[in-house]
Design a protein with these regions (language model features):
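Short, polar/flexible loop-turn hinges at active-site or ligand-entry regions and domain interfaces
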Residues: 85-93, 110-112, 163-171, 190, ...
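Short, intrinsically disordered, charge-balanced linker/junction segments flanking boundaries
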Residues: 271, 458-467
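ATP-dependent adenylate-handling active sites, centered on carboxylate activation for C-N bond formation
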Residues: 4, 8-19, 87, 128-153, ...
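Short, conserved phosphate-binding/catalytic loop or strand-edge motifs used
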Residues: 98-102
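Short amphipathic alpha-helical segments and their helix-coil junctions
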Residues: 84-89, 441-455
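N-terminal glutamine amidotransferase
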Residues: 1-74, 103-221, 242-246, 269-271, ...
Length: 467
């Protein structure tokens, strides 16, 4: 993990300010730091060295010095793109994916984004055009925040780096607070800070004297194909998984793997052929502690398992630190376990694989079985709606919520796996009035893109974009 910061607009002591901003994200890159300050632009980078350890330092400059890059992430297919660029006449001075990214942008422009395979967040400053170009990977694995503060445009890997800039104004965005109560996080591009936004996944931006433009460069597609037989799908999934895991292991340092008792992380650990796996658990209850299973599985695949039981004291003692690193409220408790497992892994290596994101693709959430699980779904929707409205007005009683939910279309009732407070509940709890959009207004654009798909696919598509 690396991190970067930057801002436009000439300001006194820009080199001191950018250094303070870099120091705020030192935890993202303990191996090295670099900065570039020139009139209208200041860039800073903190590096965790993974590929071309000696020559991949940043900020990284183009051959003629006209462009400067700060980059967080990995381009897994950088070697094949590099070969294409060499055939096009490009000459390289390093073996890093950083240089491939910058030269690729010079050669292909925005087309490069769809050529790349990886996780990335980056910003390029064009000295001649006085223009910033930034982009974020397909699923938003790597972060990119930006803020408009008067004449100053700030950007970086974490919001906390903005706080030390003298022109940053720290104000609570109450709209994000209301959305958080339903989604467990801020589901739109807005953040908890006024005038601070996050670049959506699969988007790029251009910032110059003409203004700010943000556009999507990629869309995920769920193209169902019922023709192949089960064995065909087994073989296809196996091929894709092996290819993906092998691509993710592109590194000049050792790679490990997280391991729980789940199918996803177990599958990844088994085919990755790494030397070390990492697991954490809470207490001794098997519902919250999967260390025993992880050790047994690691032994079966002949790998070293590193584990830790998190005590209540460690849990509460680190909670504020965990929240600090997330910048914004996030009500997903799995973030705490991830913090601890990352902590034990970081003591032995720099790169780990995980099974995160597999439930959305493989339909792993229990709620995905709901559309096909009851005979009641065969009752006409008009009848279910009437029953649902009657039940909604009745005093709370076990079982009534089933009829309320089934009296609504999927688009009305399912707003993602993170659903917490209803719009009416959050309005009654909050003491402030906001113009926050309703949950269904936020999810509507995603449902529109898969309006002809089956309900399970719709749910997967929504979660893939919103959870």
């Amino acid at each position: 993990m690396c991190g970067y910061v930057g801002f436009t607009n000439s300001i006194d002591n820009a080199n001191i300010i950018i250094k303070k901003m870099m120091d705020k994200i030192k935890h993202r890159g303990p191996d090295a730091e670099g900065q570039y300050v020139d009139g209208d632009i200041a860039l800073g980078h903190r590096r965790l060295s993974i590929i071309d350890i000696n020559l991949g330092a940043q900020p990284f400059f183009s051959e003629d010095g006209s462009k400067v890059l700060v980059f967080n992430g990995e381009i897994y297919n950088y070697k094949s793109i590099r070969e294409q660029l060499i055939k096009a006449g490009r000459v390289f001075k390093t073996n890093s994916d950083t240089e491939v990214l910058l030269q690729g942008y010079e050669e292909y422009g925005t087309k490069l984004l769809n050529m790349m395979r990886g996780m990335f967040s980056f910003v390029i400053w064009d000295k001649n055009k006085k223009e910033l170009f930034g982009a974020r990977d397909f699923f938003g694995i790597k972060p990119l925040y930006y803020a408009n503060m008067g004449n100053t445009f700030m950007f970086g890997s974490e919001i906390k780096s903005f706080l030390v800039h003298p022109e940053f104004v720290k104000e609570l965005n109450e709209t994000a607070l209301e959305n958080y109560m339903t989604f467990q996080y801020s589901p739109t591009s807005e953040t908890f800070f006024k005038n601070v936004s996050k670049l959506p996944p699969a988007h790029y931006f251009i910032k110059n004297a003409s203004g700010f433009k943000c556009e999507r460069f990629w869309e995920v597609k769920f193209d169902a194909d019922d023709k192949p037989q089960l064995n065909d799908w087994v073989n296809k999934i196996s091929d894709i998984m092996h290819d993906s895991v092998e691509a993710h292991k592109v590194s000049d340092v050792e790679v490990g793997s997280f391991l729980s008792s789940g199918v996803d992380s177990s599958y990844v650990a088994a085919i990755a052929n790494v030397d070390k796996t990492f697991t954490v658990g809470f207490g001794t209850d098997e519902k919250y502690n999967e260390i025993g299973w992880a050790k047994e599985f690691s032994k079966a695949i002949n790998k070293e398992n590193n584990s830790k039981v998190i005590t209540p004291e460690e849990y509460w003692g680190n909670l504020s630190k965990i929240q600090y690193h997330m910048d914004e409220p996030l009500a997903d408790p799995s973030a705490i376990a991830l913090y601890f497992v990352c902590n034990i892994a970081s003591k032995k290596l720099k790169v780990v694989l995980s099974g995160e994101g597999a439930d959305e693709i493989f339909g792993g959430y229990n709620v995905y079985s709901e559309p096909n699980s009851t005979f009641y779904d065969k009752v006409p929707m008009a009848v279910r709606k009437r029953i649902g409205k009657i039940c909604e007005k009745m005093p709370a009683r076990r079982g009534l919520n089933f009829f309320v939910r089934k009296g609504k279309t999927l688009e009305e009732r399912f707003i993602g796996n993170a659903y917490m407070f209803t719009p009416s509940e959050r309005k009654s709890i909050l003491k402030v009035k906001t113009n926050a959009p309703t949950p269904t207004k936020i999810t509507a654009p995603f449902y529109e893109k898969v309006k002809d798909a089956d309900d399970v696919t719709k749910m997967q598509y929504l979660d893939l974009h919103m959870w």
